[in-house]
Amino acid sequence: MALRHFLTLRDLSSLELNSILDRASELKRQQHANQVYQPFKGKVLGMIFEKSSTRTRISFEAGICQFGGSAIFLSPRDTQLGRGEPIEDSARVISSMLDIVMIRTFGHNIVERFASFSKVPVINGLTDDHHPCQLLADLQTYQEHRGSIKGKTVAWIGDGNNMCNSYMEAAHMMGFKLKVGSPKGYEPKPEFLAEFAHCVEVFNSAEDAAVNADLIVTDVWASMGQEEEQKLREKAFLTFQVNEALMALAHPECLFMHCLPAHRGEEISENMLDHKNSVVWDEAENRLHAQKALMEFLLNENAKRA
């Protein structure tokens, strides 16, 4: 039985993905009821951050601690994968001392190479190409508020980035339609579009993408590492702000999500996070519960190999 990792959503079957989402909501109910559940006492999560993040660190560290385990945080100063010691060597050593590893980095090939030589499950906390953990939280949040997302229409407004790529995978696996609204030159990569043409439609207009949507999602215009492009991107994305006027084009019960941190007055209007259909704060909290369900799944799957 092969070691299981979570580098993209498609490392899970659709059945496993749905099971993890249901389990996340169950763990959330337990947590809110102050029920203690510590199946992983003595287990250690290694968190390797080459890209910093408040939400990712807190949610993973709190999650493993609530399970009775502990976490080790490695900042960019502590380890530089592939710069100095080869990634393959780092993976062999680090994984020999841990039970599970989460990596948040730039190139997706870094997590792939690390996982190839790891003795324990590896979780992609974010790469330039994928953000699957955020999708777990988003899918859980939609399910909790509106039920099944199958057959629904999701509008992605903004850059064809890692979040957009993971949404395309989710559309394929969960059976919803994804309408991407991006400025010309900022659409998703052609290879992703070609693979998911059956469930993804691209528009160079935010309004066209938002029409009849059941969920509208956006992200910052310039991600970490794109700061030099900020002014150029502000100009390109000027008509791609999510605001009340855009929400009015969607279904009346359309939800709004943003993975945070948000730049009010840029990709969203000043009050959008507090819009009556915004579920951003539930979405943020669900990072904790979704990742707990994921870690439980991977650790239990790995235990079957012993």
Swiss-Prot record:
<keyword id="KW-0963">Cytoplasm</keyword>
<feature type="binding site">
    <location>
        <position position="287"/>
    </location>
    <ligand>
        <name>carbamoyl phosphate</name>
    </ligand>
</feature>
<keyword id="KW-0055">Arginine biosynthesis</keyword>
<keyword id="KW-0808">Transferase</keyword>
<comment type="function">
    <text>Reversibly catalyzes the transfer of the carbamoyl group from carbamoyl phosphate (CP) to the N(epsilon) atom of ornithine (ORN) to produce L-citrulline.</text>
</comment>
<dbReference type="InterPro" id="IPR006130">
    <property type="entry name" value="Asp/Orn_carbamoylTrfase"/>
</dbReference>
<feature type="binding site">
    <location>
        <position position="104"/>
    </location>
    <ligand>
        <name>carbamoyl phosphate</name>
    </ligand>
</feature>
<dbReference type="GO" id="GO:0042450">
    <property type="term" value="P:arginine biosynthetic process via ornithine"/>
</dbReference>
<dbReference type="InterPro" id="IPR024904">
    <property type="entry name" value="OTCase_ArgI"/>
</dbReference>
<feature type="binding site">
    <location>
        <position position="219"/>
    </location>
    <ligand>
        <name>L-ornithine</name>
    </ligand>
</feature>
<dbReference type="GO" id="GO:0006526">
    <property type="term" value="P:L-arginine biosynthetic process"/>
</dbReference>
<protein>
    <recommendedName>
        <fullName>Ornithine carbamoyltransferase</fullName>
        <ecNumber>2.1.3.3</ecNumber>
    </recommendedName>
</protein>
<comment type="pathway">
    <text>Amino-acid biosynthesis; L-arginine biosynthesis; L-arginine from L-ornithine and carbamoyl phosphate: step 1/3.</text>
</comment>
<dbReference type="InterPro" id="IPR036901">
    <property type="entry name" value="Asp/Orn_carbamoylTrfase_sf"/>
</dbReference>
<feature type="binding site">
    <location>
        <position position="162"/>
    </location>
    <ligand>
        <name>L-ornithine</name>
    </ligand>
</feature>
<feature type="binding site">
    <location>
        <begin position="259"/>
        <end position="260"/>
    </location>
    <ligand>
        <name>carbamoyl phosphate</name>
    </ligand>
</feature>
<dbReference type="GO" id="GO:0004585">
    <property type="term" value="F:ornithine carbamoyltransferase activity"/>
</dbReference>
<feature type="binding site">
    <location>
        <begin position="223"/>
        <end position="224"/>
    </location>
    <ligand>
        <name>L-ornithine</name>
    </ligand>
</feature>
<keyword id="KW-0028">Amino-acid biosynthesis</keyword>
<dbReference type="GO" id="GO:0019240">
    <property type="term" value="P:citrulline biosynthetic process"/>
</dbReference>
<dbReference type="GO" id="GO:0005737">
    <property type="term" value="C:cytoplasm"/>
</dbReference>
<dbReference type="Pfam" id="PF02729">
    <property type="entry name" value="OTCace_N"/>
</dbReference>
<dbReference type="Pfam" id="PF00185">
    <property type="entry name" value="OTCace"/>
</dbReference>
<dbReference type="InterPro" id="IPR006131">
    <property type="entry name" value="Asp_carbamoyltransf_Asp/Orn-bd"/>
</dbReference>
<feature type="binding site">
    <location>
        <begin position="53"/>
        <end position="56"/>
    </location>
    <ligand>
        <name>carbamoyl phosphate</name>
    </ligand>
</feature>
<feature type="binding site">
    <location>
        <position position="80"/>
    </location>
    <ligand>
        <name>carbamoyl phosphate</name>
    </ligand>
</feature>
<comment type="similarity">
    <text>Belongs to the aspartate/ornithine carbamoyltransferase superfamily. OTCase family.</text>
</comment>
<dbReference type="GO" id="GO:0016597">
    <property type="term" value="F:amino acid binding"/>
</dbReference>
<feature type="binding site">
    <location>
        <begin position="131"/>
        <end position="134"/>
    </location>
    <ligand>
        <name>carbamoyl phosphate</name>
    </ligand>
</feature>
<dbReference type="InterPro" id="IPR006132">
    <property type="entry name" value="Asp/Orn_carbamoyltranf_P-bd"/>
</dbReference>
<dbReference type="InterPro" id="IPR002292">
    <property type="entry name" value="Orn/put_carbamltrans"/>
</dbReference>
